[in-house]
């Protein structure tokens, strides 16, 4: 008897190999983004305003990569798509190692942004094909792996940067080579998954793309809006907050320490969530808890004047990040028909990318006009507003939602 994809453990990608790919690519990526502003400003003498444009282009590239990857995943064999994405990323990083002047660095960073969105969406989409584990567990583990990569990368980059920026780019490229080799040998089962999709269409089982029910679509739009708004505010931790802390007399290396704290807590939290997947009654409860923590974290910033209080704010923020961010793509997966899972995983990346692209600009405008304290209140209120919208919406729709496990 012919078994469907996932019924035989040999014809499904093993979760461990998705973890390896996630780790390698995120360690490599974490060699690049922390040093970009410092390298461009201190080494290449690029103004902060131009650096803002460079980072914006990187985020726009990520958005475009996410959209295209989600579109092609649902329509084509994902195996060559992921190979091309990871392989080209390795090539671009080798080119960055050889040519990292101006404006070449800008070009390479924009391309890596596109490929980062492409690869991230494909990894999440590949995860939706796994049937041996609950979606919540898979996305928690992948988010854990992502942040373990960030912890490792950001810890190493500070030491290697003082030694050689070229070496950093070479090591990042080699990590993507590892991810490429891993994909070549271990992602082949996705070919069978794609073949079954094609056979289903040819046999008439799924001749047409399954439309997403209207209620599911509305709920997903609420999640995407929440992601965009949350990232819009969160990105100010990566940009404007460093200036604020330094203005209060807190050394820059203490600000950097907050990100090590952030990633470490995420790793611990994801380990706990993986060990106790039913800690929250439903994915929606997990999302609401996380978004609530985000709102509270910005309120605590109103009163933060020393490192201890900033660390407390970061801990609260990280509890929100560790719970909400992996739960949203998992819930979106449950709400998405099998013929459009890639599309909607791409949409989660796009929503995040929009928030990341415009966050520093939005925060800078509010801070320039009103100051930091009013911005913290604005951020908290807007994030809390997402909860006010989502809870009654979910209560109205949840019994009528169609779930696609």
Predicted regions and their residues:
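Juxtamembrane intracellular "pre-TM" segments in multi-pass secondary transporters
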Residues: 1-12, 189-225
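Helix-loop boundary and gating motifs at the non-cytosolic
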Residues: 8-59, 219-259
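Conserved MFS/SLC helix-loop-helix module at the cytosolic interface between two early adjacent transmembrane helices
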Residues: 64-100
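Helix-to-loop junctions at the C-terminal end of transmembrane segments
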Residues: 65-77, 161, 269-282
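Cytoplasmic membrane-interface "Motif A"-like loop-to-helix N-cap segments
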Residues: 75-86, 278-291
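Paired small-residue
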Residues: 92, 103-112, 308-316
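Cytoplasmic helix-loop-helix junction between adjacent transmembrane helices
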Residues: 110-146
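Symmetry-related core transmembrane helices of the 12-TM Major Facilitator Superfamily/SLC fold
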Residues: 168-185, 376-392
């Amino acid at each position: 008897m012919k078994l469907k994809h996932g019924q035989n453990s040999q014809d499904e990608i093993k979760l461990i190999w998705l973890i390896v790919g996630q780790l390698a690519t995120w360690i490599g990526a974490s060699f690049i983004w922390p040093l970009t502003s410092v390298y461009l400003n201190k080494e290449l003498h690029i103004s902060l305003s131009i650096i803002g444009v460079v980072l914006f282009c990187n985020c726009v590239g990520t958005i475009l990569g996410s959209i295209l990857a989600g579109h092609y995943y649902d329509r084509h064999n994902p195996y060559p798509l992921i190979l091309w994405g990871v392989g080209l990323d390795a090539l671009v990083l080798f080119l960055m190692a050889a040519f990292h002047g101006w404006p070449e660095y800008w070009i390479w960073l924009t391309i890596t942004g596109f490929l980062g969105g492409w690869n991230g969406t494909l990894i999440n989409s590949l995860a939706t094909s796994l049937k041996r584990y609950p979606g919540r567990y898979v996305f928690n583990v992948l988010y854990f792996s992502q942040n373990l990569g960030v912890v490792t990368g950001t810890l190493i980059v500070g030491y290697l940067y003082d030694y050689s920026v070229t070496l950093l780019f070479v090591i990042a490229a080699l990590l993507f080579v590892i991810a490429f080799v891993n994909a070549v040998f271990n992602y082949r089962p996705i070919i069978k998954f794609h073949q079954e999709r094609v056979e289903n269409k040819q046999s008439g089982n799924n001749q047409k793309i399954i439309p997403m029910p209207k209620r599911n679509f509305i709920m997903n739009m609420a999640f995407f809006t929440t992601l965009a708004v949350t990232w819009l505010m969160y990105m100010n931790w990566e940009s404007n907050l460093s200036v604020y802390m330094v203005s209060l007399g807190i050394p820059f290396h203490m600000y950097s320490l907050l990100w090590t704290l952030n990633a470490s807590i995420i790793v611990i939290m994801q380990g706990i969530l993986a060990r106790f997947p039913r800690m929250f009654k439903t994915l929606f409860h997990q999302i609401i808890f996380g978004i609530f923590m985000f709102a509270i974290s910005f309120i605590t910033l109103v009163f933060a004047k020393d490192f201890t209080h900033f660390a407390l704010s970061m801990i609260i923020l990280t509890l929100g990040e560790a719970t909400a961010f992996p739960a949203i793509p998992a819930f979106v997966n449950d709400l998405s028909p099998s013929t459009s899972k890639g599309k909607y995983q791409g949409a989660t990346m796009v929503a995040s990318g929009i928030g990341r692209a415009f966050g520093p600009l939005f925060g800078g405008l509010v801070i320039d006009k009103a100051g930091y304290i009013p911005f913290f209140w604005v951020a908290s209120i807007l994030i809390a507003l997402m909860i006010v919208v989502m809870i009654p919406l979910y209560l109205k729709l949840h019994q009528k939602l169609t779930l696609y496990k």
